[in-house]
Amino acid sequence: MRTEYCGLVTEHLLGQTVSLCGWVHRRRDHGGVIFIDLRDREGLVQVVCDPDRAEMFAAAEGVRNEFCIQVKGLVRGRPEGTINAGLKSGRIEVLCHELNVLNASVTPPFQLDDDNLSETTRLTHRVLDLRRPQMQHNLRLRYRVAIEARKYLDEQGFIDIETPMLTKSTPEGARDYLVPSRVNAGQFFALPQSPQLFKQLLMVANFDRYYQITKCFRDEDLRADRQPEFTQIDCETSFLGEQEIRDLFEDMIRHIFKTTIGVELDATFPVMPYSEAMARFGSDKPDLRVKLEFTELTDAMKDVDFKVFSTPANTKDGRVAALRVPKGGELTRGDIDGYTEFVRIYGAKGLAWIKVNERAKGRDGLQSPIVKNLHDASIAAILERTGAQDGDIIFFAADRAKVVNDSLGALRLKIGHSEFGKANGLVEAGWKPLWVVDFPMFEYDDEEARYVAAHHPFTSPKDEHLEYLETDPGRCLAKAYDMVLNGWEIGGGSVRIHREEVQSKVFRALKIGPEEAQAKFGFLLDALQYGAPPHGGIAFGLDRIVTMMAGADSIRDVIAFPKTQRAQCLLTQAPSPVDERQLRELHIRLRQPEQPKA
């Protein structure tokens, strides 16, 4: 039926007869000669239909966009002046001898080359959307990334082992997707949030190096970089320390980027402690392309009359930080007002600022509504610590540390990536990877009045912090590490707990008693008693990596059939109701939401 792909018909086939199959991308009637741009997964080729072959020409007159057709014809060079340098096949055309309509198409709801389609339209008609060249490129790129990951891991001695999709619900973290059991009435499986426990069990079982490219499921609120089901390159290895694990998977990411998109990442990724990342950038996934950093001012603002600064400076969880923007004096009041509204999204109550017109004049060279509320020592500290120069602007955030980090961190990125930031060299092009390490082991949950695991409860504390598990859990740092690239966390992992007594101590620190621990994790605690080896691993978000490589706006652009931000599939209309008989078989009765009283 087909001898060549359309997009691969080039000058090497001149003078040969070919058989092509594909879709009509565009049909043009030029004064009795019909031109068809025929498309398949490899690209386009121009087909010329002359009227001297009456049966073929009649068929060509009847085809429309997205008809699926077969063409047989002669490859010839294009006439002078009609060469299309933008196409791989742009120097040739196919003179059609025979045209068969394999399947007609109704009028498509949109043109495939329309770049202004809403995401709703695209996802509703996903099959047609996937015919678009960009989507074809994205999914083939995804395939190549997966292949190169497999090649690398295979060369390093990793074994691809599947783990269960129907498993036990262990509600520590995001909500599980639950699957009712028909056979065991009233009991439920959960879809895995990750293969975490199974891959640890595989290490205990002496498989030494495991990986799989697998689906994971989390019932959480969605954002541009989240899906209810997502794909991980999931890895675990025994008898390697934290540094060795990071080196191994840093090499994997370098290999993938080089072989798939020809990018040479740094020979060595910088390593930054979590505390430093939060202090300098307000984020545990800093975008190092942006050349702006926080300046710590909390201690210098404790005794100022300006309560907006002094109150958080004297509060246990408060912070005062500054962000100096070189040449920011050019920003208009309208720009500043826009940034003020922007930081409110992140909980900030406002945005204080100082323009440095002439630093040598001290406070007289500063322009700001807040200068009058600051004493000379605090002003000197601001100018000295930020390194402010004439023509700069300094923005301030003062609140709970989380609000300061979130709001000023978001402002840093917004300014850095703005047209102003690009014009003034505040952002670099390219790829800026790093490792963020030494995360807190626990976070305190005020509502539950207990510590919760910052990563997951199977992460090992640093050796020197083991004693804090029982005396001061808040001081514990974890052997955890995230790989960050251009402000995205693309991978995260840790060294795991391999001794039962340490795992039990962690459960106690989390207020998980012995009975609860046995009920939820007894199989793990049992396995750890049989000479479990030191082990650790990492999981990479395949969707995120491909999104970055493709320059896509959302991971929905690199997944064949994604869900919306409301966790719905617009193509299949899932989720959907099921009939009463199915529910009865599962021993389930639906409880309808209560209607508000009139």
Swiss-Prot record:
One of its GO terms (biological process) is aspartyl-tRNA aminoacylation. Belongs to the class-II aminoacyl-tRNA synthetase family. Type 1 subfamily. It is found in: Cytoplasm. The record marks 30, 81 as: Important for tRNA non-discrimination. Homodimer. SUPFAM superfamilies: Class II aaRS and biotin synthetases, GAD domain-like, Nucleic acid-binding proteins. HAMAP family: Asp_tRNA_synth_type1 (MF_00044). Keywords: Aminoacyl-tRNA synthetase, ATP-binding, Cytoplasm, Ligase, Nucleotide-binding, Protein biosynthesis. It comes from Burkholderia mallei (strain ATCC 23344). Residues 196-199 are annotated as: Aspartate. The gene is aspS. This is Aspartate--tRNA(Asp/Asn) ligase. ATP binds at residues 218-220, 227, 489, 541-544.
